[in-house]
């Protein structure tokens, strides 16, 4: 009798464990056939988001969710495209301040020419392989952008930003991390309050501002460069034959150029001003906490 009772308890425990696991983990899936001209809008209270452009005319939505009894995910098609929402329900306002126990990840495939608008309060953003505009905002994670041909506006309050192979005007903001960009052919406007900025192989007009780190920029074509930092060095790499008018000044180090400048003004080795190859678009460099180095691009 005791043996049978023990077996019953074990079986009952397994059933409860399986039931609890099922309740704590579930998924959401939906797909829509779409026409050119629409866009994707995603607005969620919590969750990381990954969006990939495909050679298709479908929007395919998949979400993996933990502790999802308190998250209501919905997706609908309308005249402007597809809208996806994720809303936390059934929790007190105090519980809503801490959503770390809710692990949610959205994975969405869209047509390559489908513009996307993303907003999440609790996760990272990853967007790849689009020939359309991107707008993204997160309060709690990093941002990754790759192979985007179109304008970009993205900001995060809690992570770094990494981007590669961009072709379009790009505006990036972060309050808590570094910004790294490789291979960009559009205008760049980037700003961080808490990290370094690294721009490699970029074209277009460049504006980069940081309050808490160094700035490194390798610029292939000079269409105007504006680099400032309050807490680090500035290193600018330029082609030897580029035309530029350079104005570089530091309050905490030396300003120097390994490229020959004409009409050079040097004030106590902290202020460097001159024309490169006869002059051209202005290059403005300022730092309060480090040296400035202008070097030839190898």
Feature names for model-found ranges:
Residues 1-298:
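Intrinsically disordered, low-complexity terminal regions
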